A protein has these predicted regions:
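Serine-hydrolase-like catalytic core of hydrolytic proteins
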Residues: 1-103, 123, 154-180
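Acidic, glycine-rich loop-and-strand cores that form catalytic or ligand-binding grooves
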Residues: 113
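Substrate-gating cap/lid region and adjacent catalytic-acid/histidine neighborhood
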Residues: 116-223
Length: 223
């Protein structure tokens, strides 16, 4: 998930959401071949946890993915982890800086050794920690595949209308907090700021989404 215009152009103008395109291709294959394995192509259920749930949240708002699955399960991930174009451009710029390659040089980007790409990716995550809600590499809004933020598509009734099971995994945050001193040191104000990056805006009644979600978590996990 790296919004690089040069790579998109080299693919005939395809959007930069190559990760989502891979998932859509896999779902198309499953739908086309499910019957051969005794399955029902009209009853496909997708299940994702953490980043997998975030991707499903994006697919639910992608018109091209409509009809490929009939129900979905999202655990510890939501439809809010998608970059607007300006945030995706920021991640792209920092990644190219770390890799030492111009964002306009598609050939050099494709030729970069895997080890260098992975090392640059790790440095980007660290550089942008605290500036952007992790993970830094996420799907992004584009005109071809994901025309709007999924959370907005849900609010407007434009996301896929299928049965959903949504939940969280108990104590999952501890896994991330172990390796993130900043997360372990969060106070109430810092927690609110972090949620505001992930859930900007307000509900129809004018209350910030971030504050509402924090209240819901506290009410469900007393003590």
């Amino acid at each position: 998930f790296l919004s690089l215009p040069e790579l998109a152009a080299s693919e005939g103008g395809a959007p930069a959401n190559f990760g989502l395109l891979d998932q859509i291709a896999a779902l198309e294959w499953v739908r086309a071949n499910a019957a051969a394995f005794g399955g029902d192509p009209e009853r496909i259920c997708v299940f994702g946890q953490s980043a997998g749930a975030m991707c499903i949240g994006a697919l639910l708002a992608a018109p091209r993915a409509q009809g490929l699955f009939a129900r979905a399960i999202l655990q510890s991930g939501a439809a809010s982890n998608v970059h607007p174009p300006e945030r995706a451009a920021r991640v792209c710029a920092v990644f190219c800086e770390e890799l030492g390659v111009s964002a306009r040089d598609g050939r050099a980007l494709r030729a970069a050794p895997l080890a260098a790409v992975l090392a640059a990716q790790a440095r980007v995550q660290e550089r942008l920690r605290g500036e952007l809600e992790p993970p830094a590499f996420q799907p992004c809004v584009d005109a071809a595949l994901l025309p709007e933020l999924p959370i907005d598509a849900f609010a407007a009734g434009r996301a896929a209308r299928i049965p959903l099971l949504v939940g969280t995994n108990q104590d999952e945050w501890k896994f991330y907090a172990v390796g993130d001193p900043k997360a372990r040191a969060l106070d109430a104000a810092g927690l609110l700021r972090r949620f505001e990056r992930a859930l900007p805006g307000c509900d129809p009644a004018g209350r910030p989404w971030a504050a509402r979600v924090i209240e819901a978590y506290r009410a469900a996990r007393v003590g």
